[in-house]
């Protein structure tokens, strides 16, 4: 399946100059969603992953089905103040700004193998921040999985040493 045909391009969103890659058409199409989940799951099958971590919000949309298929848990990473228990936090750079993320302090057990699943790899700031949170809790990042990669933003360069999968690549 050509997932590129299921990704809607929205110009000047969320701010002027950004060409937003909208994954909601994938979510709407059960065959496209099954294909996406299957491709990520296939990549992870031999990685001995114990848990999937997904950053808010679109990481939830793709990470939970992958965790379900692998019969493992899912741990959310959220914006500050959204998780009810004790958290660890990290500041990170976005393609178009800066932000912070938090994870529950008991979300990852020491020594667990973790795959981080998200919709998009742009500058790499978000996933690098999530990786730092996982490692702060004693987890090992086994894989980084993305539906989309914006290659010209060179996010992959910040993530050397990690196994990276992206299903669709765009040049800007």
Swiss-Prot record:
Catalytic activity: AMP + diphosphate = 5-phospho-alpha-D-ribose 1-diphosphate + adenine
GO biological process per UniProt: adenine salvage; AMP salvage; purine ribonucleoside salvage
Subcellular location: Cytoplasm
One Pfam family matching this protein: Pribosyltran
InterPro entries: Ade_phspho_trans, PRibTrfase_dom, PRTase-like, UPRTase/APRTase
Cleavable signal peptide: none
Presence of the UniProt keyword Cytoplasm in the record: yes
EC number: 2.4.2.7
The protein's enzyme class: transferase
The keyword Glycosyltransferase is annotated on this UniProt entry: yes
Protein's pathway: Purine metabolism; AMP biosynthesis via salvage pathway; AMP from adenine: step 1/1
GO cellular component, one term: cytoplasm
Keywords from the UniProt entry: Cytoplasm, Glycosyltransferase, Purine salvage, Transferase
Physiological role: Catalyzes a salvage reaction resulting in the formation of AMP, that is energically less costly than de novo synthesis.
Subunit annotation: Homodimer.
Classification via PANTHER family: ADENINE PHOSPHORIBOSYLTRANSFERASE (PTHR32315:SF3)
Name of the protein this chain belongs to: Adenine phosphoribosyltransferase
Name of the encoding gene: apt1
């Amino acid at each position: 399946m050509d997932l590129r045909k299921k990704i809607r391009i929205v110009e000047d969103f969320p701010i002027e100059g950004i060409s937003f890659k909208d994954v909601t058409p994938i979510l709407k199409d059960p065959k496209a969603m099954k294909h996406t989940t299957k491709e990520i799951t296939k990549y992870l099958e031999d990685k001995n992953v114990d848990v999937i971590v997904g950053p808010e919000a679109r990481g939830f949309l793709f990470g939970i089905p992958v965790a379900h298929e692998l019969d493992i848990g899912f741990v959310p990473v959220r914006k500050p103040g959204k998780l009810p228990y004790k958290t660890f936090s990290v500041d990170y750079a976005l393609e178009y700004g800066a932000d912070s993320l938090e994870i529950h302090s008991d979300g990852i057990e020491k020594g667990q193998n973790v795959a981080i699943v998200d919709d998009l790899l742009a500058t790499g700031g978000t996933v690098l921040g999530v990786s730092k949170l996982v490692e702060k809790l004693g987890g090992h990042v086994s894989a980084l999985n993305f539906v989309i990669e914006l290659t010209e933003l060179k996010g992959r360069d910040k993530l050397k040493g990690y196994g990276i999968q992206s299903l669709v690549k765009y040049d800007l």
